Amino acid sequence: MAMLSFEKKYRVRGGTLVGGDLFDFWVGPFYVGFFGVTTLFFSVLGTALIIWGASQGPTWNLWQISIAPPDLKYGLGVAPLMEGGLWQIITVCAIGAFVSWALREVEICRKLGMQYHVPIAFSFAILAYVTLVVIRPILMGAWGHGFPYGIFSHLDWVSNVGYQYLHFHYNPAHMLAITFFFTTTLAMSMHGGLILSAANPKKGEPMKTTDHEDTFFRDAVGYSIGSLGIHRLGLFLALSAAFWSAVCIVISGPFWTRGWPEWWGWWLNLPIWSQWPLN
C-alpha cells in the first residue's frame, strides 16, 4: 500500500517502550515495534493451538469446535494438555496478544505526540475478557469457571451461567451494561447519520457545516452536545458498557450466589410500601 503524502514526516525514530530501534520500523502502512512482533507471535501461536486442538477433537464443524477449560477438579492448577491445559495456554496467548496490541498503540501515540485515549479504551475490552477467564475463575477457585473457546459451546456456557442465577437479567450491573451498549449504538448511529447527511447535500449544494449539525439536534431534542462532546460521550458510553459487563459477571458467583431476583428484596422491603401486603 502506497504511503500517503503526509505520512512520511510522522515516521520518526523514538517513542518505543521496549527494544529501542531494533523493531522501530514499518511494513507498508503498519508500524511494527517490539509489541507488534509479540502480537504476531502470540496470535499465530494461539491460532495454531486452536487448530491443533480442533484436530484432536471429534469434528471439524466450525460451529461445534470447542476448546474447553479444565475440569473443576484441577482447581487453579495446571491441567493436562488435553484436559484443559490447551485452554490455559491459548488463554495466555490471547492475553499476550491483546496486551501487546494495546502497548503497540501506546508506542504509536508516543511517536505522534498524542494522548492515550485509544489504548485506554482498548484496555477496557481487555479487562472484560480477563475478568471472564482469569479474575472470576481465580475468585471462584478453579479455571473451569472460564468459558470454552467455541461458537456453540460458548453460547451454551452463557446460557448455563444465566440459569445458575435464575434470571440473569435481574443482575443490576447487567442492566447497566446492556443500557450502555444500546445507548452507545443509539448515540453513535445518530452521530454517524448526522455527519453523513451534512456531508452529502443535494447535487449542486455546498457541504453543510457544524452549525447545521448543531441546529439539527437543537431542533430535534432541544440540545446539541457539540462536535467534540459527542466523541467524549461516545467514549464514555462505550467504556461504561465494557466496565459494567465485567462487573456483572465478576459479582455473579464470587459475591452473589443466589438467584438475582432475590437481590431485589431490599426494594420490596422499603418502608414506603412494605407496610402493604403484596397480595
Swiss-Prot record:
Tell me what organism the protein belongs to. Rubrivivax gelatinosus
- Family statement: Belongs to the reaction center PufL/M/PsbA/D family.
Which topology term describes how it sits in the membrane?
Multi-pass membrane protein
Enumerate the PROSITE patterns for this protein.
REACTION_CENTER
Disulphide-bonded residues: none
Summarizing the function annotation, the protein's role is: The reaction center is a membrane-bound complex that mediates the initial photochemical event in the electron transfer process of photosynthesis.
Q: Which residues cross the membrane?
A: 33-56, 85-113, 116-141, 171-200, 226-252
Q: What is this protein called?
A: Reaction center protein L chain
Q: SUPFAM superfamilies, per this entry?
A: Bacterial photosystem II reaction centre, L and M subunits
Its ancestry begins with: Bacteria, Pseudomonadati, Pseudomonadota, Betaproteobacteria, Burkholderiales
Binding-site residues, Fe cation: 191, 231
Biological processes, Gene Ontology terms: photosynthetic electron transport in photosystem II; response to herbicide
Q: Where found in the cell?
A: Cell inner membrane
Looking up Gene3D superfamilies in the UniProt record yields: Photosystem II protein D1-like
